[in-house]
């Protein structure tokens, strides 16, 4: 805590500034629904919301770096005037950042998964700012337990990383963000196929739904807990036959997703405007497909002794239905692109042959 008269005035000014930021940015905005309530009449001349987002993320990141420097241990106590200036410089672009959001929310080219990512990154930034403000408020009140971290302000690092995420949103755009999501989807499909491969190499028949209830049963006799004998080799061959076929289906779906992902970031792909609803549908359906793939594999592994194809009949039917929905949406996106539409048609023929 500063001791001189001038320094004490700076302490008061800084505390007032911190309280003001708390009231302006941190109290009102704690969840995505709060951000959606922002009303703005922001009009951009000669620019776009995406370009402005990138500029503001860069400016915020630069001011965040300066704040980290002037607030580090050993520097903060003698630098309150500079700290006030840097925090003010940070709060101005933050205000403009939030005023941009209605332009994204009301834009028919911005799918929900994209604005969800914006919300997540912005709330991370505000969470970091919330921690930072709380740390400085405690420090100014001379709380004996307060500290600014031994090495650096962790909260400043959170803000810095959130600025990077916002910048990534602006650079990638809706199509690039979806491409990033699909990259993870493809990796999960690889994991699923590896899981199948590992099970076939080292089959485990110990899993059984009856095991869940064993601890609750009285052990009155050996026969009560005995399991039905089964032909392990026959069961294994049945599961192997199913898994071999199912792996081919996963590979084909992976081909669809990975090819579509490459299209999204391809320079020769020029989608029409107002495709947010189509992109959201594709995103949703592909998530459903991944869940169904995992559900089928889990069903087989959960009770392998009693497995029959009938056990996953509903899941496979649902998989076919949702995949056809994806193809319809992809075809919409490929309107005016006969080469890619033809590829979709060819893929669907092969898909129908497997199912």
From Swiss-Prot:
Q: Which InterPro entries match?
A: GCIP-like, GCIP-like_N
Q: Which domain of life does this protein belong to?
A: Eukaryota
The record ties this protein, via Gene3D superfamilies, to: I/LWEQ domain, Talin, central domain
Q: What is the disulfide pattern of this chain?
A: none
Compartment annotation: Cytoplasm
State the UniProt keywords alphabetically. Answer: Cytoplasm
A GO cellular component annotated for this chain's UniProt record is: cytoplasm
What miscellaneous comment appears in this entry?
Present with 9100 molecules/cell in log phase SD medium.
This one is known as Uncharacterized protein YLR287C
């Amino acid at each position: 805590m500063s001791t001189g008269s001038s320094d004490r005035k700076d302490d008061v000014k800084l505390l007032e500034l911190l309280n003001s930021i708390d009231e302006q940015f941190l109290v009102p905005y704690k969840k995505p629904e709060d951000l959606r309530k922002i009303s703005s009449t922001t009009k951009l001349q000669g620019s776009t919301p995406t370009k402005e987002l990138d500029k503001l993320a860069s400016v915020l990141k630069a001011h965040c770096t300066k704040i980290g420097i002037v607030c580090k241990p050993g520097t903060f106590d003698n630098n309150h005037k500079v700290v006030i200036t840097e925090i003010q410089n940070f709060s101005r672009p933050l205000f403009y950042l939030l005023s941009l959001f209605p332009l994204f929310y009301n834009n028919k080219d911005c799918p929900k998964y994209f604005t969800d990512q914006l919300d997540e990154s912005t709330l991370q930034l505000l969470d970091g700012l919330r921690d930072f403000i709380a740390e400085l408020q405690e420090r100014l009140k001379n709380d004996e337990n307060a500290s600014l971290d031994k090495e650096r302000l962790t909260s400043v690092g959170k803000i810095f990383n959130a600025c990077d995420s916002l910048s990534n949103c602006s650079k990638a755009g809706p199509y690039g963000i979806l491409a990033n999501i699909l990259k993870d989807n493809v990796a999960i499909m690889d994991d699923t196929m590896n899981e199948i491969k590992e099970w076939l190499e080292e089959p485990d028949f110990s899993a059984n739904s009856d095991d869940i209830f064993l601890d609750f049963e009285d052990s009155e006799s050996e026969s009560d807990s005995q399991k039905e004998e089964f032909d392990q080799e026959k069961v294994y061959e049945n599961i192997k036959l199913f898994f071999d076929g199912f792996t081919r289906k996963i590979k084909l779906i992976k081909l669809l997703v990975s090819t579509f992902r490459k299209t999204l970031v391809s320079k020769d792909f020029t989608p029409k405007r107002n495709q947010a609803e189509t992109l959201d549908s594709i995103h949703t359906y592909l998530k459903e497909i991944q869940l169904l793939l995992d559900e089928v594999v889990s069903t087989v592994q959960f009770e392998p002794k009693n497995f029959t194809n009938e056990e996953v009949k509903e899941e496979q039917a649902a998989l076919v239905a949702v995949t056809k929905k994806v193809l319809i949406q992809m075809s919409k996106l490929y309107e005016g692109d006969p080469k890619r539409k033809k590829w979709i048609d060819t893929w669907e023929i092969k898909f129908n042959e497997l199912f």
